[in-house]
Amino acid sequence: MTSRTNEFFGLTKNGDIDAANIPLKRISYTDPFLAEGYRIHETIVNLLVFLKKIRGAYLKDRTFSNVQRLSKPLMECSLEELSKLELDEVQRDEIEHEVSSAISSCIHQIAKLQEIVKEQQSQIPKKSGWLQGLRDPSKLSKKETLVAHHSSVLWYLQSELSDVSSVLYHLQDLRLKRGQEKRNIASDFLTKNPTDENSAVEIPESELQTFFTQQQLQELEQENDVLLQEFEHTMERLRDTGKSLADITRLQSEISAQLSIQSSAAEKLYDDALNVMDSLSGGNQQLIKAKSRSSRTARLLFCIFTVMGLLLLSLDRIV
């Protein structure tokens, strides 16, 4: 087949079409499966882009927030807007929770699509020998191609979702490690700081009234309560972060298991397609052999009848 690429480019030049100004059209699928798959794909891509844009603000060492200055949701902000963003610990936890919920929702939707593929696969008749392939090969091929395509779509969606969960897990892990490093540095500074004349001296509780007034003691108690609350809040955040990391690990395990199942299903479909091809090839060979046998029989009968005709003519002349 000759290449007509140059002819195509010539036609586009003659048409004076500016490809850059052609408006993009949203893909419209008549197949509900593909429409749902495209919607899940769009959600996953938006999550991945958001995590990459929010990475800088998420990992900043800040304890205050300026999110209220934004006029639109975080998902719709540009990279420049998010780079100037300041987040507190609560908002970081909210981002993790929202992304984890979106990942779980995508997993649930993909599971529904898997049930559709299983139902489609169950409708394909079992093959037993080459005669089964000769009954209606075009119809069987269409069904199997559709199932194989849908399985490939599921595999691709699960692969994308695995990438998103890996990015989120990496961000959470970095946040946890940095928090642990800061606490270790502060602890080392307090324990290794050499004692001097300004170092704190432990005062017996019975002598506190001598060194401090009642108001000073109340202020110290209040400061101590605040420090305890901050410590408890930090420990609670650590527990929540650990729980979130465990949830992400669980999600990754589920996605990996589903990817393995989809890979096995794709390999099975590929083997089935090869078996169909072998069956069709065997059927074609049988047809060729049958055709060859029938042609040989016809030639043999033609020769026999020709010889008999000649004999009859000869006998007629003799008589």
UniProtKB/Swiss-Prot annotation:
Residues 316-319 are lumenal. One of its GO terms (biological process) is retrograde vesicle-mediated transport, Golgi to endoplasmic reticulum. The keyword Endoplasmic reticulum applies. One of its GO terms (molecular function) is SNAP receptor activity. Keywords: Coiled coil, Endoplasmic reticulum, ER-Golgi transport, Membrane, Protein transport, Transmembrane, Transmembrane helix, Transport. The chain crosses the membrane at residues 298-315. It is a single-pass type IV membrane protein. GO terms for cellular component: endoplasmic reticulum; endoplasmic reticulum membrane; SNARE complex. Residues 228-290 form the t-SNARE coiled-coil homology domain. Residues 1-297 are cytoplasmic. Coiled coil: none annotated. It is found in: Endoplasmic reticulum membrane. Component of a SNARE complex consisting of ufe1, use1, sec20 and sec22 or ykt6. Interacts with sad1. Belongs to the syntaxin family. Syntaxin required for targeting and fusion of Golgi-derived retrograde transport vesicles with the ER. This is Syntaxin ufe1.
